[in-house]
Amino acid sequence: YCGTVSLCIHDKKESKTAGYNFCHSCGRTSTLKNIQKHLARFVRIKRMNRISIQAVAEHRPETEKWLLAYDCYQIEIIELASIIEVLFRDYFEALLFISCESKKDSFLEKIVRKYTGNDFMNIEKTNDIYKKAFGIEIRKNLNAETWDDLLDIVNLRNMIVHNNGQVDKRFESTSTFRRWKDRVDIPLIKIEDEDIAKLLSSVIDAVTIISNLYLKEYYQRRNRVIANYYFNKENAYDFFADTE
């Protein structure tokens, strides 16, 4: 997952084949496990937030809950946006590196990061990047509600981070504003606990679907690397000697 690809032949019998569950170069586990850790952190943050909100609500019963929880819900949306970025960027880089030379290339990594920049925080640009690089159209594999929820998470996150959680002209130009306009109480936007639950559900759906798309593409590209390794060895006798 860091761009290092190695061939480790464990056994010639198919029934005994095995593989590492981590990268022996950088120590990272899979992108999916990394996302699972992010989701676990989100659950911890959400749990602590709900305890805090309940405690404050008992002392401020006259204040609407969404106002008391405004900052808490913003933190949770930012965390969901981080999960989305990890999902798209890490899977993209893993597929790209295994498609290239079977070794880490720092120059290639710099080119990728320079070209993509923060594009993986833009859902529509992400769809375009995957389509151009791998022929994968993410949008076609997600239902309309999930796609819109991902857009909403990122647009809300941008408003929260860049304008202190207050509705601005840039946010008003987004599709999210059109879907949430009944929630707007200038300069704030009304976010409820149910909204967070719905957005989380869509993130989990997206993680599941995109992870399956990734695995299908990954195995195909991995097998090409392995086949290319064997069929392009300089000396066929060396190949058979290595397998003895």
Tell what function each PLM region has:
Residues 70-96, 161:
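Short, hydrophobic, well-ordered secondary-structure elements
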Residues 1, 13, 96-185:
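Flexible secondary-structure boundary motifs
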Residues 1-44, 166-244:
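Polyanionic, low-complexity intrinsically disordered segments
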Residues 34-63:
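Intrinsically disordered, low-complexity segments
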Residues 89-100, 212, 216-219:
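Perimembrane helix-loop junctions in membrane proteins
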Residues 55-77, 132-145:
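A long, hydrophobic alpha-helical segment
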Residues 25-30, 66-70, 107-113:
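Short, charged, low-complexity loops and linkers
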Residues 79, 83, 149-159, 195-198, ...:
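Charged, amphipathic alpha-helical oligomerization/scaffolding segments
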